[in-house]
Amino acid sequence: MSNDKRRSLTIYNHITYFLYVISYFTAGLLWIVPIVMNYAKRHDADGTWLSTHFDWQIKTFWYSIVWFIIGIVITAFALGGFGVSMLADSGNIAIGSTLLAGFGLLIVTFTFIWHLYRIIRGWIALTDGRPVP
């Protein structure tokens, strides 16, 4: 791979990492842009240390989406049970629903922190010119 091509792909990866960080300020609406960018240029980096960054970002995206959806579904299910318990005057259901909603929110929070950690770790490795594991 030529130096110009490697430099271009390095800048491209900096942009995608940046877009992932910016997506936190757009309620995740920009998440789709860097993942499309990663899939578009992924094969251009085959056989280089830069390919690890494309794979790292793609895996980070998909695992984050799956766990975020799981957390949201658990929370929504629990809050629905909480609403039913208010109508039925059942304290046990209310306590269980509150605990389950807390568990769902814990999953969402952990996913948020894990995603941010992976973006920061990957971006630091890219800046240092190293592959990510």
Predicted regions and their residues:
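Membrane-helix interface segments in multi-pass membrane proteins
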Residues: 3-6, 71-109
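Hydrophobic alpha-helical transmembrane segments in multi-pass membrane proteins
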Residues: 60-75
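Alpha-helical transmembrane segments of integral membrane proteins
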Residues: 11-14, 18, 29, 59, ...
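Membrane-interface extramembranous regions at the lipid-water interface
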Residues: 1-26, 30-62, 117-133
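Hydrophobic alpha-helical segments
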Residues: 31-37, 65, 78, 82-85
